[in-house]
Structures are given as C-alpha cells and as structure tokens.
A protein has these predicted regions:
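Non-catalytic scaffold segments within catalytic domains of secreted glycoside hydrolases
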Residues: 1-138
C-alpha cells in the first residue's frame, strides 16, 4: 500500500519512479512506506460489507533495516481498523522468504527469511523473529 505522486513524464509503467515526501522513508523498491494506505483501502472497501483478507503486504529490504518498522506500523493500523469494526479475517506478510519477483528477478528481498539462492539455505531475519513474537501474542 502506497500512494503515487504523478506529474508529466514519458516513462514505461515498469520503470515508474515513486517520489517520496520529505518525511517519508522509501523502500528499496522506491515506494514510500505508507501504512495509512492500508487503512484508507480498508475504509474504501468497508461499504461493500465483505470480509477482507490481506494477502500481500511487505517491504523490499535486503538488510532488514526497515521491515520491522513496516510490520509494526502496518499491524498497528490493521489492529485499529479491526477495533473500529472492519471485518479483516487474515493477514499474510509478503513474503515468508526471499523469492523471484516477476519484474525484478532475485534482486528484491521481501522475505522474513533470507534465502541464499546458491545453497538454498534459509535464515530467519530479525524482523521474522519480531513478527513471530507479535503473532504469538495475538
């Protein structure tokens, strides 16, 4: 969930730039971290009266420096929305482990587990331990 600032330019959709505001933190993908976008999406969908499942919410972060904050912000916004009556049935972080991204190949690291693509060894990242703790408590 992010927002897009637009202006005149001639670019391919796959090579779009996502400018950030001065107070925003950008992910390695170039998207601003925007937890409020999750709440706005839930508020927009609420009138439909259908159960919601969040199936992909994550951040490209090879060094795992942003993912914990991303998780905390988004899960806090999600918990507030649920307390306010939104019928959210599930949340699935993107992704359990680093994987192949269709447009970016193996260059973007979304996983709660680091994957060494040469050996296939998987290692839990600190953000994965934080997520584990959060879901154990709730």
């Amino acid at each position: 969930y992010t927002h897009v600032l637009v202006g005149p330019a001639s670019v391919s959709l796959l090579k779009m730039k996502f400018p950030k505001r001065a107070h925003e933190v950008a992910t390695e993908f170039g998207y601003p971290m925007y937890a409020e976008g999750l709440r706005r999406a839930l508020d927009f969908l609420a009138p439909l009266g259908v159960p919601i499942e969040i199936t992909e919410n994550g951040v490209a972060d090879a060094n795992d420096t942003l993912r914990t904050e991303h998780l905390k912000r988004h899960l806090w916004v999600l918990s507030q929305a649920i307390q306010d009556g939104h019928d959210v049935r599930s949340y699935h972080h993107w992704s359990l482990m680093d994987n192949f991204e269709w447009a970016e190949g193996y260059s973007m690291r979304f996983g709660l587990h680091h994957v060494d693509f040469e050996t296939q060894e998987r290692t839990l990242r600190p953000s994965g331990a934080v997520y584990k703790h959060i879901i154990e408590q709730h």
